[in-house]
Amino acid sequence: MSVQAGTSPVLSLAGLNKSYGALQATRDVALQVAAGEIHALIGPNGAGKTTLVRQIYGSEAPDSGSIRLRGEEIGHLSVPQRVRQGIGRSFQISNVLADFTVIENAVIAEAARTGGAFRFLRPAFSDPALVEGAMTILSRVGIEGRADTPVSDLAHGERRLLELALALAGDPALLLLDEPMAGAGPEETQHMIGIIDRLRGDVGILLIEHDMDAVFRLADRVTVLVEGAVIASGTPDEIAGNTAVRNAYLGSDDDAAA
């Protein structure tokens, strides 16, 4: 599997297998994400996408296979260790702290990603580097003006942007985005697409998304997962023209005519 010319893979997966009893969730998965590219992972519900992301992030262990971040094997590392090595993740369901302000969430994320241990927020706010880092990640997604706003007062789209900002804490090399447009309205979706597009070149992104318009607007490359196995990987144009992909996921011409 090739990566973009002149770039090295920030993430390399080889031979990843994961079974739950008789159910094989991932089957010999191989995938590469180049530094700075947006690589979309698509497939029908139950295809194994989230299971694969959990293996990359470290919340589940594969039965076999290799996971390399910037050339280094990380399969033996814990989630906190992988985060410190350069992995950020946003989740399908928002996991921000609703009882805190936007900046408090960002400071906590910066402290956690940089290995800091703060029992209370006051010591964290006494560290200028943490506060500066927190404001930087908020500005990267355009919500620095909401820094002092309680999270409970944010609109849904703003919460999703905050979640993206928190995933950027610690300046990761790889960002795992699990349906960042979930639950968003048309305007919020377009805004999120623009924010993610501006991250291109700064961080490698593995994007899981059911919104095909967003996928084909954002992705440099697309990998299609069906029943835990990769059935195709290529440019958006190559994937859109792939008959097997259309039949398995996007819908065949016969289905469209039915």
Each language-model region and where it sits:
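Glycine-rich phosphate-binding loops of nucleotide-dependent enzymes
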Residues: 2-258
